[in-house]
């Protein structure tokens, strides 16, 4: 199997990050997702802050999250990843945003960023002593290896999806048993 390497900025439609501002919290509004809301297998929307519709629209002018985008925690806990496989209605703060319209490309990036090879590579790029972070420029420059044959890509994605679905199911089952 042959691979080619592209920078994330070449592979994705664009690479951005969420707002750096701190929108005022409101009692009921739109969710504002930060790194602490990205979990191993999903988003914790329940503990996300609510922001006003005005702030939501302002944040989304710069960093609108759409279906097939990949979110990446880039401050504090680095490397938690979420692939958006639905139409979202939240805004993001200090989160890497890999914008990808193509579903298969989105899935490949999601799984590729989870590999030990990429995690080690990203760890070598971290800055900051008190609170570590990875820069937006470093995210744009990430080398993404992709099979040259799209059929190889599809086969790999299929296998990884089956494994992840099984892991997710087992994790939920274990959590339910612990809660009982």
Name what the model sees in each region.
Residues 1-18, 141-180:
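Non-catalytic DNA-recognition/assembly elements of restriction-modification systems
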Residues 1-4, 31, 88-89, 111, ...:
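Residues that recognize and position ribonucleotide moieties
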Residues 5-24, 36-67:
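Sequence-specific dsDNA recognition surfaces
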Residues 29, 47, 92-94:
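A generic structural signal for short beta-strands and their flanking turns/coil linkers
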Residues 34-35, 51-116:
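A short beta-sheet element
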Residues 74, 89-96, 128-157:
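A short glycine-rich beta-alpha junction/loop motif
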Residues 107-140:
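Short, positively charged
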């Amino acid at each position: 199997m042959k691979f080619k390497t592209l920078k994330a900025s070449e592979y994705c439609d664009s690479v951005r990050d969420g707002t750096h501002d701190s929108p005022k919290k409101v009692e009921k509004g739109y969710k504002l997702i930060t790194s602490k809301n990205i979990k191993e297998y999903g988003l914790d929307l329940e503990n996300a802050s609510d922001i006003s519709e005005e702030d939501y629209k302002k944040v989304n002018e710069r960093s609108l999250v759409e279906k097939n985008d990949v979110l990446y925690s880039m401050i504090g806990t680095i490397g938690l990843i979420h692939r958006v496989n639905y139409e979202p209605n939240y805004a993001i703060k200090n989160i890497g945003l890999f914008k990808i319209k193509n579903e298969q490309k989105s899935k490949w990036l999601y799984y590729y960023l989870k590999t030990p090879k990429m995690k080690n590579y990203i760890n070598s790029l971290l800055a900051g002593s008190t609170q570590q972070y990875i820069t937006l420029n470093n995210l744009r420059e990430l080398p993404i290896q992709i099979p040259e044959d799209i059929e190889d890509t599809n086969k790999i994605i299929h296998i990884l999806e089956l494994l992840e679905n099984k892991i997710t199911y087992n994790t939920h089952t274990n959590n339910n048993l612990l809660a009982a």
